[in-house]
Amino acid sequence: METRRITAEEARKLAERRLTAEERVCFDLFSLILEREDALCRSDGAHCLLAQSREDTPLWVWLSHELPEAAEDEAAAGLAESLARCPALHVTLDPDRGQGVLRKAAERSGLTPETVLPMNVYACRKLSPLPLRGHAVVPREEHRPVMATLLRQMALDAEGQEVPEAAAADFAQAMVGSDRLLLWEDGDIRAMAMIAHIGDGMGRINTVVTERNSRGRGYAGMLTAALCEKLLAQGLTPMLYADAGNPSSNRAYQKIGMEACGQVTEYRWK
């Protein structure tokens, strides 16, 4: 069956029908993308779903476990069309299922995929007890400088990107009093993390960062556990994407009771 453009509503129904519980965690970004009724979606109705908010935003590609060759060809064709419109496109999919699609899209487009970030996907259904040093606090006005600093440290250390001081200051100002961002205080502010999005029964945690001189002491795990507790109390399943190349952060998440649900990898094209 050929892929065709579908509406966000059709994509939501397809995801509910075809994705397993674990896949819905791995592709939690669909819940954010598909909040937009004008989201760009394509599917064959059974074996693949491609979705992005706009032509220049990251494309997420779900592929069924048993992927027929015809469906693989169609998914590759859809990906190649997206690359023709935006060669700088970033694409995220299951690396084990997606190699054929990547190869065929490369043949069609003349571009080569390059790994940006392999990610382990975690969900927390029950917290494990954790000894605590310090406590979580809601950000106050006096925390603006440290929030801006932590954001810039995270972007530079994790992604090699510089966040302009003005942008970091704007972020910090917006987060004062937020019910979605928490700081961990143990004498000084040691870590920061936030609930980035809530949808489809899940709460996605990101922007997890520990102050450089405080790393390796468990603060990120303690703070993530506090956010998980908050989400679980609301009947939501906490989830997050973790850099597969950072074993210490993965251990921290596992220690608080987060369970691995699968892997996805982000690619860019050259």
What would you call each of these model-derived segments?
Residues 1-26, 127-162:
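Short amphipathic alpha-helix that is part of the acyltransferase structural core
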Residues 2, 28-87, 193-206:
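Conserved donor-binding loop and adjoining core beta-sheet/short helix segment
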Residues 55-57, 63-133, 267:
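Acyl-donor-binding surface of acyltransferase catalytic domains
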Residues 64, 211, 215, 243:
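Residue-level recognition of the GNAT/N-acetyltransferase active site
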Residues 69-82, 210, 216-233, 250-255:
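Conserved acetyl-CoA-binding loop-helix of GNAT-fold acetyltransferases
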Residues 102, 106, 252-253, 258:
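Conserved active-site tyrosine of GNAT-family acetyltransferases
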